[in-house]
Amino acid sequence: MRVTVTGATGRIGTQLVGVLRRRGDEVTVLSRNPDKARAALGVEVHAWQPESEPAPTDALAGRDGVVHLAGEDVAQRWNDDVKRRLLSSRELGTRNLVAGLRAAEPRPGVLVSASAVGYYGPRGEERVTEEAAAGDDFLAQICIIWEREAAAAEQLGVRVVRVRTGIPLDKGGGALAKMLPFFRLGIGGPVAGGHQYMSWIHLDDLVGIYIAALDGSEWSGAVNGTAPAPATNAEFSKALGRALHRPALAPVPSLAIRALYGEMSRIVVTGQRVVPQRVQALGYSFSHSELDEALRSALAG
């Protein structure tokens, strides 16, 4: 299979490229920094400024599939400039990718585009499947626009899969990496009461879902990239403490999270109980469906 990947130097993209190469696929990467990407990944890399130009057709024509992961990192303190980048990197980047697909001949057969469980907004204890309506907060609005731009490729005859990603378990980045220093010191614990759900997923399974979406002609539309058993923040904290053999009893008040992350803290102190109903119906078998085992694996990797 010939696959083009954007956002390939991030934690998800790096592992995805590695898995694709190990199974014998030919991988091409689109990157803002081609020298860095080439050195890190050892694959063919084409320069692309996603917010200002269509994706280069020579990196798309004749490919079997495209995986679109590029976008500004959400896990940072938001201000007006960061919020602008969060939206424009996804809206314009995806629009310009589809513009490149429109000009490519022959076109790839499938586009697998990242989205996020933030699409649903805060949902409390509701069990959220792919059929649930979108939320109305800032992150939900970004996801709606992001998915709309990706879905435009369907008009070109391209099969489109939108992966609403949860919280990847990766000690090298993301939410888990930010939690680890506190838990290792024995000062970690539930955040804002710990009742909010965390829709986690092992990085191996998230990459597995992207590959299944590339390979499977029956995959289309939105799928939830989460493990089957979301946990409350309190349950997650206890499991992480067990994995590290450290106590996890120090509660973190919501005021402290708001002081640290500002508006972005809403993602941390609220949550969604998201389940991968369509992913399981499509036959995907999770390698890491139990939280304690998944955390041990992620920390050992």
Q: Where is each model-derived feature located?
A:
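N-terminal Rossmann NAD(P)H-binding glycine-rich loop of SDR-like oxidoreductase domains
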Residues: 3-23
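Conserved beta-loop-beta element that borders a ligand/cofactor-binding pocket
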Residues: 115, 148-171
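A conserved pocket-lining segment of Rossmann-fold NAD(P)-dependent short-chain dehydrogenase/reductase
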Residues: 178-201, 205, 212
